[in-house]
A protein has these predicted regions:
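A glycine-rich (often HGG/GG-containing) alpha/beta subdomain
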Residues: 1-147, 151, 155, 331
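C-terminal-of-GTPase-core extension/linker across diverse P-loop GTPases
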Residues: 2-9, 13, 143-265, 282-284, ...
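Switch I (G2) and immediately adjacent beta-strands of P-loop GTPase domains
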Residues: 55-65, 70-74, 254-282, 300
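Short glycine-/small-residue-rich Rossmann-like dinucleotide-binding loops
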Residues: 242, 277-278, 302, 309, ...
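Short, Asp-centered acidic motifs that coordinate Mg2+ and/or phosphate
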Residues: 271, 303, 331
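Generic enzyme active-site microenvironment
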Residues: 273, 307, 333
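Inter-motif core of Ras-like GTPase G domains
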Residues: 287-311
């Protein structure tokens, strides 16, 4: 338990129906008693049981300045594992800020970013992977991304890691006994069982690592470059995906001269769209700079939507664009399917994961594109309720664990001694413990919680 009692606004800033000020620490009830007066004089804050609520008034220096509700949680049955009081006042910056100031004057300290969840972690209410999931859940834009975060918060990843640790720990106990006490009558380790355990653990880690990229897309979204020749329909596509007229659309070639940005939700995926200048040869210095930025965005993007004018034959610029998309996560959209087709899609097909005929003015094409993007990025194959990795810290630890297990398997196949296998299994266990947060350094813990906002 922490010695200080902390206070902060737990809800988003700005106008709203309510705002919540959260207290956590041994003096939470004492602080609440100084700033909250129950409407029923027979009710006492100090005597309030956990999981109960009282209606009353908030006071500052003896002056009532708002009315609201106090929710009480007794340690250890609270989010942080400490005594917690949540004070719900009317929304709006002035009232909530005054309530926090009253709490500070009554003896509380300002909460640091992520301090509530950090206390939950330090008090054993959450593991480190679950604490990381809290921020993922707060940041989630799509239903699947939120489901992935909720699964991690519920302990899906922690349980999966625990199962692999248990399997390797049992194996290591036998290996250690065999290596350290060769003169004792220790049963010989069954090599088939050894191979089976190592293979199963590696398969599990391979699955987590393999799904990491698609899981990350669901959690964080992806940068998407819309590229193509002038008047191919790029800005029309941006407007279709955005659901409103974000970009100017005219018949004049070169209307878009700079990169136009817009975040959109396409199914369960957040796309950070970049509508780029039309690709062509030009002597206009401003347009040329826009085209240079277009190529740069294409190189940087995690997803490319290349738009081609289906009403015209392919040009040299079209073929150059196709070649630059080779080996990239790119979808070719042959636009204007409502007009007679003159575009030979077979010329560009080898360079793209898929080629789709679309009409960027029709809502039906939005659904077609959404399904194609989900297939290309692999998000349609993700079980949102399964264990998943989140963030570079977890991925790096999983990769180290996988490398150590693979090394143990190679050592067995090479016929080296069990002591060499034991070293590899030890390394794998260390990496899994780091993944679970069991041996995380203070620097790692700081890195996790610095992502959080004040009040969480």
């Amino acid at each position: 338990m922490q010695e200080t009692t902390i206070a902060a606004i737990a809800t988003a800033p700005g106008a709203g129906g309510i705002a919540v000020v959260r207290l956590s620490g041994a003096q939470s009830y004492a602080v609440a008693e100084r700033v909250f007066r129950p409407a029923n004089p027979g009710k006492k804050v100090a005597q309030a049981k956990g999981y109960t609520a009282l209606f009353g008034h908030f006071v500052d220096g003896g002056e009532k300045f708002d009315e609201g509700v106090a929710l009480f949680f007794r340690a250890p049955h609270s989010y942080t594992g400490e005594d917690v009081v949540e004070l719900s006042c009317h929304g709006g910056s002035a009232v909530a800020r005054r309530l926090v100031e009253a709490c500070l004057a009554a003896g509380a300290q300002p909460a640091a970013p992520g301090e509530y969840t950090r206390r939950a972690f330090l008090n054993g209410k959450l593991g480190l992977t679950q604490a990381e999931a809290v921020m993922d859940l707060i940041s989630a834009d799509g239903r699947q991304g939120a489901a992935l975060a909720n699964a991690a918060l519920s302990g899906a990843l922690a349980r999966k890691i625990g199962e692999q640790k248990d399997a390797l720990t049992a194996l290591q106990a036998h290996l250690a006994a065999w290596v350290d006490f060769p003169e004792e009558d220790v049963p010989e380790l069954d090599e088939a069982h050894l191979r089976s355990v190592l293979g199963s653990v590696q398969e599990t880690l391979d699955g987590l690592i393999r799904n990491y990229q698609a899981d990350t897309v669901l959690r964080e979204g992806v940068d998407c470059a819309i590229v193509g020749r002038p008047n191919a329909g790029k800005s029309t596509l941006l407007n279709l995906l955005a659901g409103f007229d974000r970009a100017i659309v005219t018949p004049v070639a070169g209307t878009t001269r700079d990169v136009v940005e817009q975040a959109v939700q396409l199914g369960d995926i957040r796309l950070n769209l970049f509508d780029t200048a039309g690709l062509r040869e030009t002597e206009d210095a401003i347009e040329a700079e826009g085209i240079r930025r277009s190529w740069k965005k294409l190189e940087e993007a995690g997803l490319i939507l290349a738009v081609f004018d289906g009403s015209k034959p392919p040009t040299r610029e079209d073929l150059e664009l196709a070649r630059r998309c080779a080996g990239r996560p790119a979808i070719a959209l042959v636009n204007k399917e409502d007009k007679p087709t003159q575009f030979d899609a077979e010329l560009i097909a080898p360079y793209f994961a898929m080629v789709l005929p679309v009409c960027c003015q029709e809502e039906g094409s939005r659904k077609v594109i959404a399904a194609a993007v989900a297939r290309l990025l692999g998000t349609n194959q993700i079980d949102p309720h399964a264990a998943s990795l989140s963030g570079q810290r977890q991925l790096s630890a999983a990769l180290r664990a996988r490398e150590a297990v693979a090394g143990a398997r190679e050592t067995v196949e090479a016929g080296f001694g069990l002591d060499a296998v034991s070293v590899c299994v030890d390394d794998a266990l260390d990496a899994l413990c780091e993944l679970a947060g069991e041996n995380a350094s203070e620097a790692v813990i700081e890195q996790v919680f610095e992502r959080f906002c004040v009040g969480k």
